[in-house]
């Protein structure tokens, strides 16, 4: 009898937890593609690889929301990245390297604490026809020395971040993020500050963002190491004409050491065709501190929806470089098996083609 009462008490406690918790969801993405790259070098110029995370980073995540009453909710996200081609974890082996935050939401907006996407990355992603992915996206353009260094230079995610996002106010929304450097005796080093504002109404989307990073020696940031006071400004927008969605964006990156002065322009389009979309973009980058420091990426792709959760995709990119630039198409937003990448050289033309499948669950 005592055992029965104990069992009922345990079950009752679980039921109480379940009733208080509005929802807990496990979700994920598995994304795999066959890709071939040619960096234009005289020797060892080509590589064929099976890689993970081309259109979207492969991941496993957990998210939940608890209704606290009065329009207030508590929520969390724990999301880990993986290389589906090898089964290994990504983001430097950190357990929840993609996202890990807890927060409160309500009529005042949303406040999140933890590792999360930066406002400027979300702004860039909302304008890019490739969603900063596949091989034509702005996130898939980098240098051999800088790793996943995007054309716009935006940090994907930041640690130790306090983020406030407004609710939608007549089409307007905004976000402010402050990331603590957590260095003894220095409140500046390692700090990251980001803000963004967006107007979205009907066919129109306009967004602007700014990010300032102070000497972040963090391998989990993207780019991996940012020099003193790196400042990034971004403005972009889209207009949906139904037959085509046009996109235009501008970015500028500078730092206090006068080692970076990049200007970037992106012109793109999304054309609905059948159960999918044709994607196209041109991205131009110029380093004003370097003579012959220009690069241009031309990309085209297609996504084909097999269902609401599964799609096929393919894309091709061609990146041309002046004598003192070595940009090229990385595989996509990642994570990736680094062995699948190929070194890039100044003044060379890099091409990449892939075909893959993405499944969401």
Residue ranges of model-derived segments:
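Outer-membrane beta-barrel "beta-signal"
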Residues: 345-361
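Outer membrane beta-barrel
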Residues: 22-36, 47-181, 189-191, 198-205
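Gram-negative bacterial Sec-dependent N-terminal signal peptides
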Residues: 1-21
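Transmembrane beta-strands of outer-membrane beta-barrel proteins
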Residues: 27-33, 77-79, 114-116, 175-179, ...
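Outer-envelope beta-barrel architecture signal
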Residues: 4, 22-28, 66, 70-74, ...
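Detector for outer-membrane/organellar transmembrane beta-barrel domains
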Residues: 194-304, 317-318
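Outer-membrane beta-barrel architecture
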Residues: 9, 61-63, 101-103, 163-165, ...
